Amino acid sequence: MPKPINVRVTTMDAELEFAIQPNTTGKQLFDQVVKTVGLREVWFFGLQYVDSKGYSTWLKLNKKVTQQDVKKENPLQFKFRAKFFPEDVSEELIQEITQRLFFLQVKEAILNDEIYCPPETAVLLASYAVQAKYGDYNKEIHKPGYLANDRLLPQRVLEQHKLTKEQWEERIQNWHEEHRGMLREDSIMEYLKIAQDLEMYGVNYFEIKNKKGTELWLGVDALGLNIYEHDDKLTPKIGFPWSEIRNISFNDKKFVIKPIDKKAPDFVFYAPRLRINKRILALCMGNHELYMRRRKPDTIEVQQMKAQAREEKHQKQLERAQLENEKKKREIAEKEKERIEREKEELMERLRQIEEQTMKAQKELEEQTRKALELDQERKRAKEEAERLEKERRAAEEAKSAIAKQAADQMKNQEQLAAELAEFTAKIALLEEAKKKKEEEATEWQHKAFAAQEDLEKTKEELKTVMSAPPPPPPPPVVPPTENEHDEHDENNAEASAELSNDGVMNHRSEEERVTETQKNERVNKQLQALSSELAQARDETKKTQNDVLHAENVKAGRDKYKTLRQIRQGNTKQRIDEFEAM
């Protein structure tokens, strides 16, 4: 039995390992990969490998893997990548797995500067990538520095601006906050919708020459063939939509495109190597087929996939709505719990204050009772003193009477008796005055005692009112695509041709009516302009690249990808071919 061959296939987010037989075809390996990752939109993808000469090449599906010039390694290395790009991601990419693989591949191309992206758009795209990774921004979880380990901006952008990591994070975070409530898969789609408007998105560039020998770039993409000047990959100068082309062929390094317009001459260019022409032919056929397929009614399979995707999205939206509802309920319950806790604390504080007041009143009552007792004792003493004085007065009266009687009886010693009488009279007057003074003191003490008694009664009444007040109520309970494949390595097979059918298609050139995603959203467009102005203040003009200069010129002239597309397709096919020959 033949020995199995180990194969490693790297997708954008996983590594897959298989053991294949020596007679396994490219299609059998490809089918095994798409089945493993659960992909149905297979027409966009292919398996890429590095050949023995170091060139990156697409695996041919109709040939055995072992018969192709795959670099001899163990295991054999392949990359599963998008080979063809859609015209409109929101209309064509159906499955989430397809959207995710495109997102990761496009993001990598932007970060590696294979697709030029202006700084302000790079920040916007970064915010969608962050939303896709982290979900909604939450200041409790996403603390400063939460993006420190993420590669989010092209190195060119970082080097061109005098901004710290923290300042870049702040700008990305501002937009991340705005995406609140956006599903992760919707963030991926928003990223792709912005990215597909970038001039270099989905374009395969090939170095070519016209008959004059002028070095140019040929761009092959989902919409057709475009010609670029050698120093400008951003702005094509001439364009040919797929609907204008009826035949493509090559003979050695010469490539011939026959237009549908019989009056127009052939469109001829030259590639540096035969293998380049083989690759151009394969890409032209695949892109043309997809271009025509898009302009015909969907197949049953695609209709079913779209229906299933709509159902899955609807289900996710329902689940999210349910989660949001539960979250709101939980937040309400938390707020209610906090309110009850707050009220409980307020009641406890009120109770503490009442207790303090009660204790204070109790102390005052005790003090007043003590004072009342003291006053009563003083009153008693004053009374006793008054009684004593009264007794003395009576005794004095009696003595006076006796002396008076004695005086009456004894007139003998009248002067002596008169003196004694005067003495007693004076003494009586003093005692009368002392008695009067003590009676006044007793009266005063009596008034003070009555006032103290009234204060005591009043305090007792207040205490009774405080003690009889109902206790505070308890807190309420908490409610909780086909392509004609040619061997790029077979230098003997030096010519090939393919007819491109344009039958039965609807609205051939609808792409010329498109506008960019940011033009559809005035708010985002204004934010991008504001950020562009802000970043311009921090830009190091000495580090501008050729693409930066070209992009700035396009913006100043009011050009974008679709306006340029309309412009470069103006005039008939013959005029544009003549223009190409004159370059």
UniProtKB/Swiss-Prot annotation:
GO terms for biological process: actin filament capping; positive regulation of early endosome to late endosome transport; positive regulation of protein localization to early endosome; regulation of cell shape; regulation of organelle assembly. PROSITE patterns: FERM_1, FERM_2, FERM_3. The keyword Ubl conjugation does not apply. SUPFAM superfamilies: Moesin tail domain (SSF48678), PH domain-like (SSF50729), Second domain of FERM (SSF47031), Ubiquitin-like (SSF54236). GO terms for molecular function: actin binding; cell adhesion molecule binding. Gene3D superfamilies: 1.20.5.450, 1.20.80.10, 6.10.360.10, Phosphatidylinositol 3-kinase Catalytic Subunit, Chain A, domain 1 (3.10.20.90), Pleckstrin-homology domain (PH domain)/Phosphotyrosine-binding domain (PTB) (2.30.29.30). SMART domains: B41, FERM_C. Residues 374-400, 483-492, 506-525 have a biased composition (Basic and acidic residues). Interacts with CPNE1 (via VWFA domain) and CPNE4 (via VWFA domain). Binds NHERF1. Interacts with NHERF1, NHERF2, LAYN, MME/NEP and ICAM2. Interacts (via FERM domain) with SPN/CD43 cytoplasmic tail. Interacts with CD44. Interacts with CLIC5; may work together in a complex which also includes EZR and MYO6 to stabilize linkages between the plasma membrane and subjacent actin cytoskeleton at the base of stereocilia. Probably plays a crucial role in the binding of the barbed end of actin filaments to the plasma membrane. PANTHER family: MERLIN/MOESIN/EZRIN/RADIXIN (PTHR23281). This is Radixin. It comes from Sus scrofa. The gene is RDX.
